[in-house]
């Protein structure tokens, strides 16, 4: 059967390995498997959110309120926006997919950093767009500017802070860059890990309302998957001027998040104390990683997220390290598919991190 | 800002009104609102599934197993297929979206019945495809054949049984039609309500394995939203030859269903007794609708689903009837947007149906 030609050039996203797979393939008991691979919140979901979902589980037969009135209202209040500035997605992933489908077609141009969230490129290829990347691994706005002057772009992706590397642009630099961008270019500011970055360094904080008021061609994306501990529930949001939101809405399918996801997100917004507590612990534990990696003589990228990227240089092969850890029930993310000889490790709970250090010692001794 | 031109012609799907909206707009207590508008299973979700989700609610922070190994394995066993014949979607809606994006681009042709599931056309317009519809409201395969000979088609949609009208093609007629279709045309057999149709009349039963073995250009879509009582959890599936599945997989985003949706679907498949019991009650109650409508002198379309379409002819205006019912806390689906002077009513529980008859009597007397 014939399919669209653009699909020939499309690869599928390599998701982090689930605990179930390690159980199946290596026969390790699920309670002995530690997953530090998908930047899930290791402290679990807020007990208040869990209780709410247990109470509402009986509503699984009912479609969600597709207007998402209550969630949009809560987000609008928190971020000082109008509901008409908001669209909800099945993870913020889905909203970046909407952006690409709304703006791009074959031979449209999409500008991004060399090593950034893989879905930008994958979604771009779905519509046959041309992907333009900087030479630098990390976000380098001078290179972005040069490439933009040379090629133009229908969409620019800025991942602030950047997944999978962890670095983060300063807000002021982002603003200076945005001033130079044509109003017909949609700039996607992916803030999936913004809560972490803003906690660590106020200079990194992007205020969504100020961003979209100052730059009407920008859209801010946020998620409940990381700081809000709802990775499994697939809820993200986009904030932009209503003209953009209206066009994205044309692409959104009805009922694009589940009834329980909607309820969980609404409840999670009520428990900011839990969120802040998790973020605080995250950076306490990250110090241990920085010390460990330095002691071992490897390099790491200073991180503004809930993960850290450890580079093995010419000492070890990251793919082998990740595989040996996997066989011991420790799942981390090998970055070979991102052309990095590095692993990305989610900052876990204290005892999980201690275990990671032990297993990494053991694995490296035997490689 | 400029957006893709095809979006100018895109309208958004009008979802059934949620209970929350009636509570907000008419100040009616949520426990007094009855929703017979979205073909949700009125008997709720299986208690076994509810218990499982309450147990697993703590896993909301974890991404799902993106291979969906266990769910695909269970579906493969039930339908005598291989896992490689299966793709899971956020509702079967999402899989029909995948089909359109895999096969169609601007000016591709999509053939469908005049009055059928609205998303076929909406997704088609997202890619700028040409929508070709039969003159007959209900599925008429002779007209499909004539139009196919005249125009060809990249995709043909057959909704068996048909939403929102309720009629259902015979399996043998579908097979005769499929024999005449070119192998490069993808035929989507949307079986969202097949469990109901097959229960009522064996001649309507489509066996997915036999369908895709006989016609390698066909894909069968099923859902957990209707008979399996998980409308709010957004889980559907597509069965096809692996060549088709592989291409749809290129378009699927990772983690396209939630962790709890995956668990709920797996558990729901284990409780077929609940499903059969609900379907049996559905057709018992449908008899009451047929008697009521006949007594009132209206027409209905004999239905192979969990809803019934009631036509008001020149006696009443369906939009007014639906609105007056809404103000009394009874939500039904007005079909004006489908160009029908009719309402579609989900077959509810006995007491809900009794209430609908009472309120409809009251409303019609005052119109």
Swiss-Prot record, chains A, B:
Which SUPFAM superfamilies does UniProt cross-reference here?
Answer: PLP-dependent transferases
Query: Which residues are reported to carry the modification N6-(pyridoxal phosphate)lysine?
Result: 226
Per its UniProt record, the required cofactor names are:
pyridoxal 5'-phosphate
Q: What Gene Ontology molecular-function terms does this entry list?
A: histidinol-phosphate transaminase activity; pyridoxal phosphate binding
What EC number(s) is this enzyme filed under? Answer: 2.6.1.9
The record ties this protein, via InterPro entries, to: Aminotrans_II_pyridoxalP_BS (IPR001917), Aminotransferase_I/II_large (IPR004839), HisP_aminotrans (IPR005861), HistidinolP_aminotransfase (IPR050106), PyrdxlP-dep_Trfase (IPR015424), PyrdxlP-dep_Trfase_major (IPR015421), PyrdxlP-dep_Trfase_small (IPR015422)
Keywords assigned by UniProt, alphabetized:
Amino-acid biosynthesis, Aminotransferase, Histidine biosynthesis, Pyridoxal phosphate, Transferase
Pfam families, alphabetically? Answer: Aminotran_1_2 (PF00155)
- List the catalysed reactions: L-histidinol phosphate + 2-oxoglutarate = 3-(imidazol-4-yl)-2-oxopropyl phosphate + L-glutamate
GO biological process terms, semicolon-separated: L-histidine biosynthetic process
Q: According to its UniProt record, in which pathway does this protein act?
A: Amino-acid biosynthesis; L-histidine biosynthesis; L-histidine from 5-phospho-alpha-D-ribose 1-diphosphate: step 7/9
- What CDD domains does the record point to? AAT_like
**In its keyword annotation, does this UniProt entry include Transferase?**
yes
The answer to whether keyword Cell cycle applies is no
Against PANTHER family, the record matches this protein to: HISTIDINOL-PHOSPHATE AMINOTRANSFERASE (PTHR43643:SF3), HISTIDINOL-PHOSPHATE AMINOTRANSFERASE 2 (PTHR43643)
HAMAP family referenced in this protein's UniProt entry, alphabetically: HisC_aminotrans_2
The family annotation for this protein states: Belongs to the class-II pyridoxal-phosphate-dependent aminotransferase family. Histidinol-phosphate aminotransferase subfamily.
**What quaternary arrangement does the UniProt entry report?**
Homodimer.
**What is the recorded name of this protein?**
Histidinol-phosphate aminotransferase
Read off the lineage from the record: Bacteria, Pseudomonadati, Campylobacterota, Epsilonproteobacteria, Campylobacterales
């Amino acid at each position: 059967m014939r399919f669209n030609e653009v699909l020939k050039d499309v690869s599928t996203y390599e998701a982090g390995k689930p605990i179930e797979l390690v159980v199946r393939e290596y026969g390790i008991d699920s309670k002995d498997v530690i997953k530090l691979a998908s930047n899930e919140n290791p402290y679990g979901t807020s007990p208040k959110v869990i209780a709410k979902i247990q109470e509402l589980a009986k509503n699984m037969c009912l479609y969600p309120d597709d207007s998402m009135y209550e969630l949009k209202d809560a987000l609008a209040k928190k971020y000082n926006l109008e509901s008409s500035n908001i669209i909800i997605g099945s993870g913020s992933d889905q909203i970046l997919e909407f952006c690409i489908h709304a703006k791009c077609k074959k031979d449209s141009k999409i500008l991004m950093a060399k090593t950034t969230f893989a879905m930008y490129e994958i979604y771009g290829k779905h519509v046959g767009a041309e992907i333009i990347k900087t030479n630098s691994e990390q976000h380098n706005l001078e290179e972005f500017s040069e490439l933009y002057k040379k090629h133009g772009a229908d969409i620019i992706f800025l991942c602030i802070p950047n997944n999978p590397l962890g670095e983060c642009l300063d807000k002021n630099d982002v603003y200076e860059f945005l001033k130079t961008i044509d109003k017909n270019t949609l700039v996607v500011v992916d803030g999936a890990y913004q809560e972490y970055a803003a906690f660590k360094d106020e200079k990194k904080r992007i205020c969504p309302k100020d961003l979209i008021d100052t730059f009407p061609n920008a859209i801010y994306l946020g998620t409940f998957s990381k700081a809000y501990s709802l990775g499994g529930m697939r809820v993200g949001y986009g904030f932009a001027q209503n003209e953009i939101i209206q066009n994205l809405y044309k692409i959104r399918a009805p009922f694009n998040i589940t009834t329980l996801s909607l309820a969980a997100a609404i409840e999670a917004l009520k428990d900011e104390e839990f969120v802040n507590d998790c973020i605080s612990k995250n950076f306490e534990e990250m110090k241990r990683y920085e010390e460990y990696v330095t002691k071992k003589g490897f390099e790491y990228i200073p991180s503004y997220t809930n993960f850290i990227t450890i580079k093995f240089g010419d000492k070890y092969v990251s793919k082998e390290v990740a595989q040996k850890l996997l066989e011991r029930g420790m799942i981390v993310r090998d970055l070979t598919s991102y052309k990095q000889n590095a692993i990305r490790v989610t900052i876990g709970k204290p005892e999980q991190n201690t275990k990671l250090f032990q297993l990494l010692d053991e694995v490296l001794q035997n490689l």
